[in-house]
């Protein structure tokens, strides 16, 4: 690692009136480094980066570039220092071409006229350097979110940026798009760029980061190198308590009756004949690698996918589920994996999202009471129930969707990646909600790709491999090692 930091932020404070969002924060970043910045919502990550990018002016503190003090009061100052911030919400002009967006503010001109042909040539060179699949002449509005993100990165390269800041860049990307972004980030790092990466997704941080710095309550807590990365320590740094405290699994519930019993359920394709049991008051984990068939099995139970064989029992009675409505009528709720595409209505009010599953059953005049009660029970942070769902944080959106199923008075909850895309504080609250529902006798089937979550929350774990249940784990046998052994098809774990 280069001994001279490309960036040092020393004792940075930022006040909004009497409230201090940043309280003497330090951050050091080196050339050719992927540096993750972590912390709960409200920890100060985005505020610190906006100070760096000139969107905010620091109340006090200093910034050094290549070891020399550099005053950043405006975005122009930041650009002159080689700093580019890519926000969560793209800062692009959709009606303009890719080339025009890349060159915006630095257009080639001669005699007062923009040299469009040369602008296209220069923009295409940058696009080709990224390996992007679009052209400089394409309109930005025709591109996918991932491609628009590449345009933002291309603009940074066009400006000869040396420090690239990305704020939650994978929030709206598919797994394939995320993989491509990671490949690009690693390539840029190898070319000498310093990349600051704001994320709360542990898997991404482990895959990308050379170092991780953590903020909590507007203060710098510390940094860990790649060699010292540890999920438990990161969580402790972010929330001030150990990872084990997040799960709070001490439910002490006696063995309940078989609430959900699935026998040899299959769709003849993605899901081979699969059986599992979830008892009243228990949380059962469903683990496996991406593509193993976990989500598809949950969709079969909920009636989203058509079963070609097998049987489902609810409270000991055989049931036939052809549709989600039939599942809901049986007291089954389903939190989908992708809340923004399959579950959440972003333009609708929080109250309408919460009562979506109960409107056919309850009078509309009851909706306000139902939503108000759910907001209090799940501690959803909204100014009022009519606020637009799309304006809420990821954690509050997820709690809102969980509350939709709490509102139906469920017997069974199917939760597919219940804490995906939320910060550690929101995770802790979702775990609290799950434990409370289990104490009330709800049977919960939880799909998760986060092994600490599976181990920490589950009373029993089923592991899927290539569309089939590869094994079942109980008690002390629920370990990350045993789960991965089953998930990868090496079937020597003991249940």
From Swiss-Prot:
> Cell inner membrane: present as a keyword of the record?
yes
Report the GO terms under cellular component. plasma membrane
In this chain the ABC transporter domain maps to 7-242, 250-491
Q: Name one Pfam family in it.
A: ABC_tran
Spell out the subcellular localization from the entry: Cell inner membrane
Residue positions binding ATP: 39-46
Query: Gene3D superfamilies from the xrefs?
Result: P-loop containing nucleotide triphosphate hydrolases
The UniProt family comment states: Belongs to the ABC transporter superfamily. Ribose importer (TC 3.A.1.2.1) family.
Subunit and interaction comment: The complex is composed of an ATP-binding protein (RbsA), two transmembrane proteins (RbsC) and a solute-binding protein (RbsB).
Know the name of this protein? Ribose import ATP-binding protein RbsA
Identify the gene encoding this protein. Answer: rbsA
């Amino acid at each position: 690692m280069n001994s001279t930091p490309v960036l040092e932020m020393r004792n940075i404070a930022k006040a909004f009136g009497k409230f201090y969002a940043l309280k003497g924060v330090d951050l050091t970043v080196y050339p050719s480094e992927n540096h993750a910045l972590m912390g709960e919502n409200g920890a100060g990550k985005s505020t610190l980066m906006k100070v760096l990018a000139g969107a905010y002016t620091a109340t006090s503190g200093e910034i050094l570039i290549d070891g020399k003090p550099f005053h950043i009061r405006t975005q122009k100052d930041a650009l002159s220092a080689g700093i580019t911030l890519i926000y969560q919400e793209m800062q692009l002009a959709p009606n303009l071409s890719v080339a025009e967006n890349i060159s915006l503010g630095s257009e080639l001109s001669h005699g007062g006229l923009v040299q469009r042909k040369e602008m296209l040539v220069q923009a295409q060179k940058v696009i080709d350097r990224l390996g992007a699949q679009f052209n400089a002449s394409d309109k930005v509005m025709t591109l996918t979110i991932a491609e628009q993100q590449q345009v933002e990165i291309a603009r940074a390269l066009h400006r000869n940026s040396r420090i690239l800041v990305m704020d939650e860049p994978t929030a709206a990307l598919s797994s394939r798009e995320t993989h491509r972004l990671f490949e690009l980030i690693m390539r840029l790092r190898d070319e000498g760029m310093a990349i600051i990466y704001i994320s709360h997704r542990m898997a991404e941080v482990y895959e990308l980061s050379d170092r991780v710095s953590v903020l909590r309550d507007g203060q710098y807590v510390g940094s860990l190198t790649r060699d010292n990365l540890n999920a438990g320590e990161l969580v402790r740094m972010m929330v001030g308590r150990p990872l084990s405290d997040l799960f709070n699994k001490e439910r002490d519930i006696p063995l309940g009756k078989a609430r959900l019993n699935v026998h040899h359920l299959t769709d003849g394709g993605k899901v081979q004949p699969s059986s599992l049991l979830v008892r009243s008051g228990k949380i059962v984990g469903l683990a496996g690698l991406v593509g193993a068939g976990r989500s598809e099995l949950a969709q079969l139970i909920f009636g989203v996918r058509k079963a070609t064989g097998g049987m489902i029992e609810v409270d000991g009675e055989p049931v036939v589920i052809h549709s989600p409505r039939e599942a809901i009528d049986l007291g089954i709720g389903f939190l989908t994996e992708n809340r923004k595409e399959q579950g959440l209505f972003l333009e609708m009010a929080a109250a309408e999202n919460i009562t979506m599953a109960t409107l056919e059953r309850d009078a509309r005049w009851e909706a306000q009471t139902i939503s108000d009660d759910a907001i209090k029970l799940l501690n959803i942070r909204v100014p009022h129930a009519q606020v637009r769902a799309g304006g809420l944080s990821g954690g509050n959106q997820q709690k809102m969707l969980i509350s939709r199923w709490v509102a139906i008075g469920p017997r069974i909850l199917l939760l597919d990646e219940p804490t995906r895309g939320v910060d550690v504080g929101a995770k802790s609250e979702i775990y609290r909600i799950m434990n409370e529902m289990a104490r009330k006798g709800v049977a919960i089937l939880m799909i998760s790709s986060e092994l600490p979550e599976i181990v920490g929350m589950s009373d029993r774990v089923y592991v899927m491999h290539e569309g089939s249940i590869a094994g079942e784990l109980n008690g002390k046998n629920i370990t990350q090692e045993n789960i991965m052994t089953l998930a990868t098809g090496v079937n020597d774990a003991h249940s």
